[in-house]
Amino acid sequence: MKEIGAVFRQIRESRHISLEEATGGEFSRSMLSRFERGENDLTTQRFFQALQQIKTSLSEFSHLAGIDQHSFIPKLLKEHYENMSLEHDQALYQSYQQAYQKYQKKEDFLASIILKAKILGLYPEVELAASQEELDFLYDYLFSVMVWGNFELSLFSLTSPLFSSQLYRQYTEELVQREDFKLLLDSSRPAINSIFLNGFFLAISSNEFEDASFFDHLINDHFYSENEAYLRTVYLYAKGEFLYRKGEKEIGLEKMEQAIQVLSILDCKDSANYYKQGLRELINKS
């Protein structure tokens, strides 16, 4: 990743915007100049004010700064999906754990955490839990990053099975209170919506109805656009499960069956089968 200040200066100068214009009159030119030279940081609020003044979106800046260029997540998920089995994921997990112990690269530790989340999400019968060290590492990593890009959003979304419902809600509240949240929503809406949907499912499966209502409201406040038909359908299933668990079984069951029918019509076979299995298990437990 390139120096953020240097990238900012490159964009500002290429657009013939002066230091004074870039501050928008909200802070001093000297403060911005020191930031560009890497001598000090800007507060998040001032950084995003300056970003708006140089007419640059968060996604554009993230791309130019290389914030997402070194993401190992696509490679990791490819390894995971190549041979989806508990044994394969456990072996991958051990290999990344060993690599971290040997080289102390944070990417290896994060990869092992993501794999643990995958194992927990796909194989709930396995006795496995996130350690306090892993949860602390995730929190420190995510909330010490000044500019979130697709990598941070993907990391938070993928690791949802590791958290309790209350903790995931707490972290989501911190996310939506970030000063860059509106910019994140504009540039990475699908990733944000996946975070909300994962939180909704997590709260529902934990029977934490207050948390589920919190995520339900978030989803409705930032509802999926029509071109996000898959997420709309999964949300329909989640809403049905929420109602079913709260005792409104008839309408809840109807919504879940509707969602599965839509997935089947769209030929989303794996997803349809996944939610059919989930529905059977839910009915058998009740």
Predicted segments, located by residue:
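A short, Lys/Arg-rich alpha-helix, primarily the initiator
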Residues: M1-S14
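"A position-specific structural signal for the A-helix of alpha-solenoid helical repeats
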Residues: V7, A111-L122, S154-L158, S194, ...
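Short alpha-helical DNA-recognition segment
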Residues: R15-S33
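DNA major-groove recognition helix of helix-turn-helix/homeodomain DNA-binding modules
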Residues: Q45-E60
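Short, charged recognition helix plus adjacent turn
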Residues: H63-Q90, Q261
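Helix-turn-helix repeat elements of alpha-solenoid scaffolds
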Residues: M84-Q97, V126-D136, S165-Q177, S206-H217, ...
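Amphipathic alpha-helical segments of tetratricopeptide repeats
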Residues: Q97-Q101, F137-F143, V176-L183, D216-Y224, ...
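Alpha-helical adaptor scaffolds
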Residues: E152-A229
